[in-house]
């Protein structure tokens, strides 16, 4: 029970502009509050590059829609609004960028490159293991995408997205 859309924190878009990224709710209502109130869960979340394997906040339906990326479908609204593109770097949380750049100072230059582009519904990170990849490698991959993007590379990544979604690779 509860709202269909997720109540997630704002994300960082092109040029550092904040936007609300639409997603179907896959967690219990108040999941962010639960995370903040549970020190052990918060520690695990931060330690694992802002992902929790077997997250207790994810609902039964949520596990399914996450595995097959169905929760991401509403991001087409963000694309129509001009906040995102079909292909691009991942849309990060502001606190994630801030804290992870402290942990991985070498990532700062990569983040600057990433923020010169709109985040994407899919991208190199999404088709290369998703939640199995740590922040420092993720931003490096996203920055490399921004530097070499082209129509053909975007088509290649969109085609690689199909099996990643069908087989639910790397989803948490």
Where are these regions (language model features)?
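Conserved small/aromatic sequence motifs within transmembrane helices
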Residues: 1-172
């Amino acid at each position: 029970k509860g709202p269909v859309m997720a109540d997630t924190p704002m994300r960082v878009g092109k040029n550092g502009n904040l936007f609300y990224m639409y997603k179907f709710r896959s967690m219990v209502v108040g999941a962010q509050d639960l995370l903040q109130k549970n020190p052990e869960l918060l520690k695990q979340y931060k330690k694992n590059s802002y992902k929790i394997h077997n997250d207790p906040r994810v609902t039964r339906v949520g596990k399914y829609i996450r595995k097959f990326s169905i929760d991401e479908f509403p991001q087409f609204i963000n694309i129509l609004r001009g906040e995102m593109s079909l292909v691009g770097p991942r849309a990060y949380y502001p606190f994630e960028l801030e804290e992870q750049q402290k942990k991985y100072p070498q990532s700062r230059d990569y983040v600057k490159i990433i923020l010169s582009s709109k985040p994407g519904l899919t991208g190199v990170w999404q088709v290369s293991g998703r939640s199995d990849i740590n922040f420092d490698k993720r931003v490096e991959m996203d920055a490399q995408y921004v530097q070499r993007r082209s129509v053909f590379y975007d088509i290649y990544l969109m085609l690689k997205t199909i099996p990643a979604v069908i087989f639910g690779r790397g989803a948490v």
